[in-house]
């Protein structure tokens, strides 16, 4: 895992097309902005895990149409 330190307003690049910018820090919360192409999905981890579990749940239900 790469660990970086950034200040408010600073940005990091992921590849050539994705940027992550620190927008603010309040207590133990950090606001970040992610700028990515439409074809790149960006989700919070808990939402991504729910999407994945729903996908695997629907694919294991059979598919008898």
UniProtKB/Swiss-Prot annotation:
The keyword Repressor applies. A key translational regulator that binds mRNA to regulate translation initiation and/or mRNA stability. Mediates global changes in gene expression, shifting from rapid growth to stress survival by linking envelope stress, the stringent response and the catabolite repression systems. Usually binds in the 5'-UTR; binding at or near the Shine-Dalgarno sequence prevents ribosome-binding, repressing translation, binding elsewhere in the 5'-UTR can activate translation and/or stabilize the mRNA. Its function is antagonized by small RNA(s). Homodimer; the beta-strands of each monomer intercalate to form a hydrophobic core, while the alpha-helices form wings that extend away from the core. InterPro entries: CsrA, CsrA_sf. One of its GO terms (cellular component) is cytosol. GO terms for biological process: mRNA catabolic process; negative regulation of translational initiation; positive regulation of translational initiation; regulation of carbohydrate metabolic process. Keywords: Activator, Cytoplasm, Repressor, RNA-binding, Translation regulation. This is Translational regulator CsrA. It is found in: Cytoplasm. Signal peptide: none annotated. It comes from the Bacteria. It comes from Shewanella loihica (strain ATCC BAA-1088 / PV-4).
